[in-house]
Amino acid sequence: MYGTPLPNTERDTLAPPTTANRTTAANWPVTGQRLAGSGTTLRRVNDERDDHPAPAADDHPHGESARPRPRSTDPLELGFTPRKPVPWLAPFLLISTGIRTLLAVLFGAYLDKRELQNAFGDDVFQQAGPDGGLWLDYVADLGDGFHATYSVAYLLAQPALTVDGHRLPRAQTLVMGGDQVYPSAAYEEYENRCKGPYQAALPTTPPERPTLFAVPGNHDWYDGLTAFLRLFVRSRDRNFAGWRTGQSRSYFAVELPAGWWLLGVDDQSGSYLDDPQLAYFDEVARRLGPESKVILAGPSPTWVKAADSPMAYDSIDYFIRTIIDPTGAQVRLLLSGDLHHYARYAGPNRQLITCGGGGAYLYPTHKLPERIEVPPRDTLARRASVSQPYDLVARYPDAARSRRYGWGIFARLPFRNPGFTTLLGILHTLLMLAMAGATTNWADSTDQRLFSVPLVLMVLVTVLAAVLFAKPPNASGKRHARHWLLGVGHGVAQVALATGGTWVWLALPFYGWPWPLPAVAAVVLYGPIIGLVASQLVAAYLLVAGSLGVNVNELFAGQGIEDSKSFLRLRIDPDGTLTIYPIGVDRVSRDWQVNPDQSATASWLTPKAPLTPRLTEPPIVLP
């Protein structure tokens, strides 16, 4: 989830586009056509060539689904297997995620397929609705548990939503802002956690033929973008459920109505922007001018992360400073996911919005900084832009609700992550046996000594594991002694718990039984109980550490909170006014019924109790 970007090689010699090389949309060579019905116009705009023609309007008129409507929730009928939320503290998942992250850091440059995308099409797209305006949806961090993911997908797919008195039609363009799947980028996980739920929400293409664009997040990058490119960047069968996929690379540029542009960038989990990508956007910049207004979608809210890691914002700042600013265009809106909540920072001429509520576990809002400077003053970039203050003006859930969610760690941790509780039980059982052996010298036989781990080794392992769990910052971040102090304190507390458990165990008759009965009793009786108690100690540690800004992610990842989801619905009017409707879902549906005898575009599953979306704040209007 977290990454530290490396600064790009400075390219400030990029000459501003001249009036002569900027052409108006009316004079561009245009390929493509108006899609069937009275819906959106999707056009590819190229410089006097059309190497990648748009699919004809009658290609796949009903999306890619020829599957009959299901009459049950059997995976064989649905075509995918609904998944439970990812148990983020499960031991094997922690290990595999750690290995994937390490491999991504060590070998990311070797797996990076962006350089190869230079051979793909370099299309620039146009999107416009029949009235000259456009409705656009933004959703991010979506491929997790079925209930949360499908609740959001269901709302996105409905012909219209009525939210706090506003009637909001289904968007003609859908933007997925990163992390379309969890925990890894396996194609099977994409099918079950992302594509399958969206297929059930919008099984076939409606008459307006909505279009989908996607930005890869860090979880999409775990396989070097292989599955992402296969799913979202295709020359054939350009359909994702009821949406058409349009992009030809992992990044894209879309001309929207009334001078607005949507640019989606891929910075490989915060590392850098590759040269083919910069060359692509250099060409896009030739079409921008002083009247252009830009929506920039990136995979991570680097403006927030820069508060702890000053280099985090460097890539985005470099992109704006060297690609967009020379054209005279204005970046009015930055969008990202990655942090699983809604938050908006407002500055002099720009809005910074994080909206990662598409289905992944909730991330807290009460630890967000009230004011940030973007870019940060302590960045190491040689030619950073002038820092501007931005104030936190809205968040969802609100800070009070976010704090209350934190207290749920005691109930949710052991039951959301049974493997983690089991691991704690095994660790404490071994620690108790080592302490009991050192206290009573009962390990007299060879068999007993084989099951007795040296006490000093067990204590060191326990404290070291606790320190690593606290994730002390590395050299690329700001060092905080509290990470080390809390980690050591947590380790000492676990050793103290083991000491108390050993004292209770020795007061019971089990240790005097003939071998191996004491070990069997420890595994059967002591292990489950001490594992549950130790999980509560971990929960208490996470609550205290989270209040000090340490292990905040683990405090909420361990709970897997499915509620308080969010997405954006945006409207661009023909006169150029952009209105942003931030939509929240306080409680997702957990009870679904099949919907077999409906139209082809109707959702396969409907909630038994209606979902009640609401605005997380009043609509934001950008003139």
Task: Walk through the language-model features, giving the residues of each.
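Active-site neighborhood of phospho(di)ester-bond hydrolases with catalytic His/Asp-centered motifs
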Residues: 139-140, 173-179, 208-218, 265, ...
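Acidic, histidine-bearing metal-coordination/catalytic regions of metal-dependent phosphoesterases
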Residues: 2-3, 7-8, 14, 22, ...
